[in-house]
Amino acid sequence: MHVNGKVALVTGAAQGIGRAFAEALLLKGAKVALVDWNLEAGVKCKAALDEQFEPQKTLFIQCDVADQEQLRDTFRKVVDHFGKLDILVNNAGVNNEKNWEKTLQINLVSVISGTYLGLDYMSKQNGGEGGININMSSLAGLMPVAQQPVYCASKHGIVGFTRSAAMAANLMNSGVRLNAICPGFVDTPILKSIEKEENMGKYIEYMGPIKDMMKYYGILDPSMIANGLITLIEDDALNGAIMKITTSKGIHFQDYDTTPFHMKMQ
């Protein structure tokens, strides 16, 4: 898919990886709906992007993605404003082992809800033109993490859901592709949250190994994750792909064993 002229919706767009996604999409000629619960950060983000791009290229909507009604209303506003939806990026996420219900609601449930809402608007079965859905996971979605069991579970859930939903979308001839991104440590506010007891709870005492891993593996810049996003959008052959991004190997993909049964549905 060529990005130029397309309409994208990015959750968690006010800062970090989400903001890098928005800027990368705008540079490619897309119109972008900036969705974030943080009103102050969202307004500042749009103002900064307006200095670089035409103001009509972006729309900021304050939304708590964990609130189903707010999320549904946000999709409606985006389509009413821009006329369509071509690219959906479910990026909003948190790290909170203390309030683990919140972590699951934002990191996993809202991604599933957002994906289904995106399919409602983009699927050819519903009169849409097709499109692409990118869900943000993590390397923690591919391996165990002792200090972040709930965060880890939420990211594993995204990987399993995305791969399965991609097969389903293809089976139904929806015209929508679904992929996920699993980066290593990225320089974002979430990374800083691992140092706070209010986020980590009882696991705060055991963060030494995580900090050692950060020093060993290094920390990615959000712009590198944005490069991965553009790759997943522009390569029409990628559906159900799980992209890994690390400082040592850059952009690469997770390999999975497949059966003839799975091959028929891909």
UniProtKB/Swiss-Prot annotation:
Gene3D superfamilies: NAD(P)-binding Rossmann-like Domain. Keywords: Cytoplasm, Fatty acid metabolism, Lipid metabolism, NAD, Oxidoreductase, Prostaglandin metabolism, Tumor suppressor. Its EC number is 1.1.1.141, 1.1.1.-, 1.1.1.232. GO terms for biological process: ductus arteriosus closure; female pregnancy; negative regulation of cell cycle; ovulation; parturition; prostaglandin metabolic process; regulation of prostaglandin catabolic process; thrombin-activated receptor signaling pathway. It catalyses: prostaglandin E2 + NAD(+) = 15-oxoprostaglandin E2 + NADH + H(+); (15S)-hydroxy-(5Z,8Z,11Z,13E)-eicosatetraenoate + NAD(+) = 15-oxo-(5Z,8Z,11Z,13E)-eicosatetraenoate + NADH + H(+); (11R)-hydroxy-(5Z,8Z,12E,14Z)-eicosatetraenoate + NAD(+) = 11-oxo-(5Z,8Z,12E,14Z)-eicosatetraenoate + NADH + H(+); lipoxin A4 + NAD(+) = 15-oxo-(5S,6R)-dihydroxy-(7E,9E,11Z,13E)-eicosatetraenoate + NADH + H(+). NAD(+) binds at residues 12-20, 36-37, 63-65, 91, 151-155, 186-188. GO terms for molecular function: 15-hydroxyprostaglandin dehydrogenase (NAD+) activity; NAD binding; NAD+ binding; prostaglandin E receptor activity. It holds the Pfam family adh_short. PROSITE patterns: ADH_SHORT. Homodimer. This is 15-hydroxyprostaglandin dehydrogenase [NAD(+)]. The keyword Isomerase does not apply. It is found in: Cytoplasm. It comes from Bos taurus. The active site is at 151 (proton acceptor). Substrate binds at residues 138, 148. The keyword rRNA-binding does not apply. The gene is HPGD. Catalyzes the NAD-dependent dehydrogenation (oxidation) of a broad array of hydroxylated polyunsaturated fatty acids (mainly eicosanoids and docosanoids, including prostaglandins, lipoxins and resolvins), yielding their corresponding keto (oxo) metabolites. Decreases the levels of the pro-proliferative prostaglandins such as prostaglandin E2 (whose activity is increased in cancer because of an increase in the expression of cyclooxygenase 2) and generates oxo-fatty acid products that can profoundly influence cell function by abrogating pro-inflammatory cytokine expression. Belongs to the short-chain dehydrogenases/reductases (SDR) family. GO terms for cellular component: cytoplasm. It is an enzyme of class 1 (oxidoreductase).
